[in-house]
């Protein structure tokens, strides 16, 4: 399945969650699109589970096949499968760039990573799904630091709200991964247990 690149607001309305962050159009109409959008429709257990899976996929910009691999790995790990899944998704490099305040959306962060603007521990990485580890050091590449976008982002980093598991060094455009996130530190409106139930059928 190809990555969804259509109108983000429409997808947000269908899944009833702001997939972009700060989507004013969604806030004005937070119900599904179409004539029956406001109608109360009895949702089956399967539909609720499917919607939650789709919500996770679109929040993190992950294709179906890749999402299945994330779930399989989460299921193999010790602990709660649902929480493992969310932590794996949250540990993607594009998400870390977004969380650190170097991009306004995950979609934008994915583009910045794909265009080769970052290094991890001194090595150039252009794979958005690259999984960060504890104590990783992420830098904006020196030749990219002069770009208007990063210069503007640098000015705003001092006021950015960054998760406790990350630290941003504004003057160096550097991100430090102090630890991998715990589920309680991830502010995603997701009922991951429904995803576990979906794949357990």
From Swiss-Prot:
InterPro entries listed in its UniProt record: Ribosomal_uS4, Ribosomal_uS4_bac-type, Ribosomal_uS4_CS, Ribosomal_uS4_N, S4_RNA-bd, S4_RNA-bd_sf
Keywords: Ribonucleoprotein, Ribosomal protein, RNA-binding, rRNA-binding
Pfam families per the UniProt record, alphabetical: Ribosomal_S4 (PF00163), S4 (PF01479)
Occurrences of domain S4 RNA-binding (ranges): 91-151
GO molecular function terms attached to this record: rRNA binding; structural constituent of ribosome
GO cellular component: small ribosomal subunit
GO biological process, one term: ribosomal small subunit biogenesis
HAMAP family: Ribosomal_uS4_B
Subunit organization: Part of the 30S ribosomal subunit. Contacts protein S5. The interaction surface between S4 and S5 is involved in control of translational fidelity.
PANTHER family: 30S 40S RIBOSOMAL PROTEIN (PTHR11831), SMALL RIBOSOMAL SUBUNIT PROTEIN US4M (PTHR11831:SF4)
Function, in words: One of the primary rRNA binding proteins, it binds directly to 16S rRNA where it nucleates assembly of the body of the 30S subunit.
UniProt record similarity statement: Belongs to the universal ribosomal protein uS4 family.
Record protein name field: Small ribosomal subunit protein uS4
Gene for this chain: rpsD
């Amino acid at each position: 399945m190809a990555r969804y690149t259509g109108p983000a607001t429409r997808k947000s309305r269908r899944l009833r969650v702001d997939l972009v962050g700060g989507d004013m159009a969604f806030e004005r109409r937070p119900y599904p699109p179409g004539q029956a959008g406001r109608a109360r429709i009895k949702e089956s257990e399967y539909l609720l589970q499917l919607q939650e899976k789709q919500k996770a996929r679109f929040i993190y910009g992950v294709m179906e096949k890749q999402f299945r691999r994330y779930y399989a790995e989460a299921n193999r790990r010790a602990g709660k499968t649902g929480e493992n899944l969310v932590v794996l998704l949250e540990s993607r490099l594009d998400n870390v760039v977004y969380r650190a305040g170097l991009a306004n959306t995950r979609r934008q962060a994915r583009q910045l990573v794909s265009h080769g603007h970052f290094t991890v521990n001194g090595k150039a990485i252009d794979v958005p799904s690259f999984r960060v580890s504890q104590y990783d050091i992420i830098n904006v590449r020196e030749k990219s630091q002069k770009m208007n976008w990063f210069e503007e982002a640098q000015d705003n980093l001092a006021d950015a709200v960054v998760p406790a598991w990350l630290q941003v060094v504004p003057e160096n455009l550097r991100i430090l991964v102090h630890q991998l996130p715990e589920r309680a530190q991830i502010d995603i409106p997701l009922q991951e247990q429904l995803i576990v139930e979906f794949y357990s059928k």
